[in-house]
Amino acid sequence: MIFPGPKVFIFDMDSTLIHADCDVTWKSFAVRHGLAPESAIAEADKFYEDYKAGCLDPVAFMRFQLAEFIGNTPEEMAEPCRMHFEEFIRENCYAEALQLVKELRERKIPTAILTSTNTEIAAPTAAYFGVDELMGTRLAVENGRFTGTIAGEYAVRAGKIAPARDFVMRHGATLAETAYYGDSTNDLDLLKVVGYPVAANPCPELRRIAEENNWRIIDFK
């Protein structure tokens, strides 16, 4: 499954490596465990549709998405994030994606997940895949507790380019020597600047763009 050329492989997470979107499943988890009202599921679905359409309001979304984190410490949220992975994500990890990352690790090729999902929720998935690094939206902490806001830039669309460039440079490579796997048009900014763009389980619009540009297309199972 490894193709020749790239010195570094970077993967989007939701709907790319896993058959799920953690921003949606997190709210389902929160409702299941009494951390959020039933109405949160429909609201999460609405934000997800906005995300796919490229019109997500990041401020409103983060205010909603991080409600369960506010006032808690990273240590206190580690167990809910682990439980979320076990209940919603583990069984939805694509076997072929797991095998690809395993083969890359065996060949000592640097790998990373770069996701718009916050790194607290994404951490168990990154650990399960065994990638070298997790990059994503970081949460702000003051006095040891989550504030409900983000630290730095929201890792979506063009916000993925800087962390990707930093990662590959630290591994002695350039974006031109990098493969990036993404599933939606929100990944286009990074797909356009890497040397080896891969449309993975692409939405119809990304599949069309990938075909027009002769990009690799893969559908993980």
Set out the residue ranges of the language-model regions.
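Metal-dependent phosphoesterase signature
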Residues: 60-96
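C-terminal cap/substrate-recognition subdomain and adjoining C-terminal extension
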Residues: 1-6, 79, 86-221
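Conserved active-site and cofactor/substrate-binding residues in soluble primary-metabolism enzymes
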Residues: 21, 72, 159
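Active-site neighborhood of HAD-like aspartate-dependent phosphohydrolases
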Residues: 1-56
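N-terminal-biased segments
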Residues: 46-63, 143-144, 150, 164
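A generic short alpha-helical patch detector that favors 3-5-residue windows
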Residues: 53, 69-73, 156
